[in-house]
Amino acid sequence: MNINVAELLNGNYILLLFVVLALGLCLGKLRLGSIQLGNSIGVLVVSLLLGQQHFSINTEALNLGFMLFIFCVGVEAGPNFFSIFFRDGKNYLMLALVMVGSALLIALGLGKLFGWDIGLTAGMLAGSMTSTPVLVGAGDTLRHFGISGTELSSALDNLSLGYALTYLIGLVSLIVGARYLPKLQHQDLQTSAQQIARERGLDTDATRKVYLPVIRAYRVGPELVAWTDGKNLRELGIYRQTGCYIERIRRNGILANPDGDAVLQMGDEIALVGYPDAHARLDPSFRNGKEVFDRDLLDMRIVTEEVVVKNHNAVGKRLAQLKLTDHGCFLNRVIRSQIEMPIDDNVVLNKGDVLQVSGDARRVKTIADRIGFISIHSQVTDLLAFCAFFIIGLMIGMITFQFSSFSFGMGNAAGLLFAGIMLGFMRANHPTFGYIPQGALSMVKEFGLMVFMAGVGLSAGSGINNGLGAIGGQMLVAGLIVSLVPVVICFLFGAYVLRMNRALLFGAMMGARTCAPAMEIISDTARSNIPALGYAGTYAIANVLLTLAGTIIVMVWPGLG
């Protein structure tokens, strides 16, 4: 039996789609030196190659892909977007505006200089900024801008072509810039990170290991009684001196949870909770009594929970003000917008921040109720909320405003982004509403993006050879300019107008470009995860602005429509 693969794939859109995805994901795992191609570029390359062979896919699959992707971007940005936008992020907002705004203006100028149409120009902007949201926003706006069928088809093909020709240019140039730009300015990033660490008490150890606290029991000996000198537990401040706290005391066969007024006596058996290294550093006064192996005394369930900051008595407070250790809890991580932050007593908590806390289950529950709620560990997605807000986003995108003969609408991309932000924000404030496990959210987001990339590659593949011959050199120059010049402008603005700390500034610049590989290079150069503070500050805002940039570049293009 002979099987015609070409006819088989052309006759089955679903099969073609998953063949493109599988081959593209395999290609994306390849590395060029220290740079991995990545899933997006892998799928794009495979789809372009198959597109040259005149394979095509249903455009509805492409539309669904970009809708799922942009909605999930909004859900991820939602928990911290408003707090950054309205309160904590004036500098970060301005940096993101400078980065995206300058790139938009430069792209418009280069597009007109080289005589390109809106499709090539918007695609070049998206590729040079390595930003799929720009591509999504521009494509959606083109479809709803009243352009004729032939002109629309050409613009969409050129949009994909421009993106494909400049994506690697944008990615590689930014990674190279992230490695060498810090060396061209007079302040060393490592020194800048150490400086702000001293000012704010930051833990600059980016490779800090996290351990669960353990419980061990000791019998109180004469040395420990003499050390206490008749003081109660509150006066002793045992945690400050040892890194451990007393969870239980057995006295005369009676087991009790001590309060601050308890005084240790000879023969007491005490259960100490702390990290392993804290136990190892205990003064001999604690260990000279015989270690006790008492099942009841040691019966304690240590848990680690992710606590979401919500309550007004925690939002806006510094970490030190929570006094977690006074409540028998240990802080392992602070996560903001899916980015791990340095553990700093002076970090001001935002609504939606996630604190990873360890300790006795009862104590962790108490502290969680005081500052917010324990993140649900269910693997069940609230599909009703997901679908409802998706519908709301589509309806927002249908709204149009008429000004004389000119009409303006948000489009599906902006509508879904806004609806996703609202869902993410409400999820951060209401523990029982709209829960989507991070794994499920990442899977839907990644799948939507891959479907979208497959669609744009298949539609643009037939014209890529002509495009390379006619405009390849121009695209190379334009891609480098749009990728690097806004970064330099952003650096000058942040360094000499906002006068930001260089470690925070470079992190914020990479956040404004939403480029995680470049962020890793900045952290390595600084030998610190302090730049993550700046990255988190601009990342959520930049995702929104980049989507809007794709819409704006189409709307302001002269003579369109």
Curated annotation (Swiss-Prot):
Topology with respect to the bilayer: Multi-pass membrane protein
Record GO terms (molecular function): monoatomic cation transmembrane transporter activity
Family, as annotated: Belongs to the AAE transporter (TC 2.A.81) family. YbjL subfamily.
Intracellular or extracellular location(s): Cell membrane
GO biological process: potassium ion transport
Coiled coil: none
Protein name listed in UniProt: Putative transport protein YbjL
GO CC entries: plasma membrane
Entry annotated with the keyword Iron: no
Native species: Escherichia fergusonii (strain ATCC 35469 / DSM 13698 / CCUG 18766 / IAM 14443 / JCM 21226 / LMG 7866 / NBRC 102419 / NCTC 12128 / CDC 0568-73)
Domain RCK C-terminal: 202-288, 292-373
Pfam families membership: Asp-Al_Ex, TrkA_C
Keywords, ordered alphabetically: Cell membrane, Membrane, Repeat, Transmembrane, Transmembrane helix, Transport
Gene giving rise to this polypeptide: ybjL
Main location: membrane
TM regions (residue ranges): 8-28, 32-52, 66-86, 94-114, 158-178, 383-403, 406-426, 451-471, 475-495, 540-560
NCBIfam families noted in UniProt: PRK04972.1, YidE_YbjL_dupl
